[in-house]
Amino acid sequence: MRQLVFRSLAALVCLGVLSLSQSSAATKPNQPDKPNLSGAWVLDLQASTSLDPLMTQIGAGFLDRKYAAHTKLKATLQQTADVLTIAARGPGFTFNQTLYLDGRTDPSSKQLLGATALKTRTAWSEDQKHLVEKHHIRTRQGKEGQLTIKRSLIEQGKAVEAVMILKLDEEPTPTSARQIWRKQV
């Protein structure tokens, strides 16, 4: 049971943490138009919307959903031109992930909010302002669909908004949630 809670938290981290920006939203010389996501960040639970509807649709259990709703996470991100490495921590859990930012499709078996990501593609938006991560997922009930995470700098680079949209193949209406990550001081 505890492992399920940790997997759900890992999904929470994957969804929001990846969006974090460096303290000043500076760019690296080899990425003149892209935000630098490197830095230390803290999830602002008060400013974020509930992940409960999204996690419920995926099939996450009650305890997983409640644990994710009340756990304050911290994350450290390290970005290069092609890779974003995430190390997230919370009470009793650790999550590490590497995202390839060049648009390639990466086969995966990561647990995201109770679903399994079958493959992941991460790339910058056309305007180079948003990091867009698309996961082809399978829920615990065997349904397939797409979980899209769009991250944008807000508050002059002092926070990142991560908007998550879940669209299951067999369901007409998408479900969404939003996380706000604040620069750690």
Region locations from a protein language model:
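Hydrophobic helical h-region of N-terminal Sec-dependent signal peptides
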Residues: 10-18
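Hydrophobic small-molecule pocket/channel-lining residues, especially in calycin-type beta-barrels
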Residues: 26-185
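Bacterial N-terminal signal peptides that target proteins for export
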Residues: 1-10
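Sec/Tat signal peptide C-region and signal peptidase I cleavage site
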Residues: 20-25
